[in-house]
């Protein structure tokens, strides 16, 4: 009696029997619900088609000032790419430093130094309160009360798991992702979940959490398919490993940074090696 109820785009309904199911429904972008969010030249970026749309818009010679909302990996990397197109770039984040969830301050200070050296304006400890303009974006008003003239905005704030299937049957974690075990099985053993829509086991914290990355999507897909094919293996778990490059500098990290670790435990010891 294992069936999936489906609805086609034209509204037609049908049922499909299954032996195993893999949910790979991905994630959806967090959008700012503020006045002016519907103005032209305000973009979001999650995938390659979004990036193509943004870079096509940059061909407009009247676009000179671009605001990037969110100083995580995507925000920092898109800021670099747009700066290399000759635009004046402003990078906003509510935190007091860039990449605050990934790196300790000594590393993020270095990233900020590189960004500033290459002409990117850092607007930290502030975020947009509203967007102003007649038809197109003209100004960003931030939580600090400052107004920035702007010709274009790219929102790179973050993601939420897209997990609408099995609302009553499948368990979620606090973030809304499908809760899975070390083999990516949900609470219904023949239904697996992988990638952005699912949790995965992290050795750093000894529990499951969400990792919105391509490498995690590939890794969890491998784990699920190996288990479905009855391969004898034990997943090693993830270690929050990540990396990125800006202006010919490469940065890598594995495990938790000090800020995140202190949220999980009050007694944290650490050393710095240079």
In which residue ranges do the predicted regions lie?
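Glycine-rich dinucleotide-binding loop and its adjacent helix/turn
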Residues: 20-85, 121, 174-175, 180-182
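FAD-site-proximal beta/loop scaffold in flavoenzymes
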Residues: 38-62, 147-223
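A Rossmann-like FAD-binding core segment of flavoenzymes
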Residues: 1-8, 16, 84-180, 269
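Mid-to-C-terminal Rossmann-like scaffold of FAD/NAD(P)H-dependent oxidoreductases
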Residues: 200-274
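Redox-cofactor binding/interface segments in oxidoreductases and associated redox assembly factors
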Residues: 23-24, 142, 155, 193
């Amino acid at each position: 009696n294992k069936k999936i109820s489906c609805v086609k785009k034209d509204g037609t309904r049908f049922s499909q029997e299954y032996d195993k199911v893999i949910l790979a429904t991905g994630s959806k972008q967090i959008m700012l619900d503020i006045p002016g969010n519907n103005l032209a030249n305000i973009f979001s970026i999650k995938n390659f088609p979004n990036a193509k749309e943004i870079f096509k818009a940059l061909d407009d010679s009247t676009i000179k000032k671009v605001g990037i909302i969110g100083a995580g990996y995507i925000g920092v990397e898109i800021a670099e790419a747009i700066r290399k197109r000759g635009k004046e770039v402003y990078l906003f984040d509510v935190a007091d430093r860039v990449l605050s969830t990934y790196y300790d301050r000594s590393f993020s200070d270095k990233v900020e130094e590189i960004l500033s050296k290459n002409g990117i304006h850092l607007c930290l400890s502030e975020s947009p309160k509203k967007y102003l303009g007649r038809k197109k974006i003209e100004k960003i008003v931030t939580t600090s009360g400052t107004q920035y003239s702007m010709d274009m905005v790219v929102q790179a704030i973050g993601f939420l798991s897209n997990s609408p299937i099995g609302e009553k049957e499948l368990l979620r974690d606090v973030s809304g992702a499908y809760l899975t075990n070390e083999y990516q099985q949900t609470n219904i053993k023949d239904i697996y979940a992988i990638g952005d829509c699912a949790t995965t086991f992290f050795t750093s914290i000894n529990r499951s959490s969400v990792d919105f990355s391509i490498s995690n999507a590939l890794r969890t897909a491998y784990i699920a398919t190996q288990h479905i094919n009855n391969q004898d293996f034990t997943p090693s778990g993830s270690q929050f490993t990540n990396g990125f490059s800006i202006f010919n500098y490469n940065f890598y990290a594995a495990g938790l940074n000090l800020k995140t670790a202190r949220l999980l435990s009050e007694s944290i010891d650490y050393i710095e090696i240079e």
